[in-house]
Design a protein with these regions (language model features):
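Conserved, structured core segments of small domains
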Residues: 1-105
Length: 105
């Protein structure tokens, strides 16, 4: 299952508390990426918070993996998790084809 994880900084988080942990954070993110569970990572262009795409069996697994990040362990950040399902809207197009509609290409 794909899980979208949106970082949020927790109250009281200041830049000086982040700095000593950033190298270890990058190392752990790289490990998660190498393991195949972290598929993509981006920064929000306006807020400089992380947006991650994870591949996990369920949201609880994603929450557990994210809890291994040094910034999470230090209580500086947390994540909002959004489980994703495949888009099935294209089925509406195929329904018409099965009702005798011709495929015109």
């Amino acid at each position: 299952m794909k899980i979208l994880a949106l970082e949020r900084e927790l109250p009281g988080s200041t830049g000086d508390r982040f700095q000593p942990l950033l190298k270890d954070e990058a190392r752990r993110v790289w490990e998660l990426q190498q393991s195949g569970t972290l598929r993509e990572i981006y920064f929000h262009a306006e807020e400089h918070t992380a947006i991650l795409m994870l591949e996990c069996a369920h949201a609880e697994e994603a929450r557990h993996l994210l809890s291994t990040l040094p910034l999470v362990q230090a209580g500086l950040i947390d994540f909002v998790l959004i489980p994703l399902a495949p888009y099935d809207g294209f089925a509406r197009l195929i329904e018409g084809l099965t009702d005798g509609e011709q495929n015109v290409s």
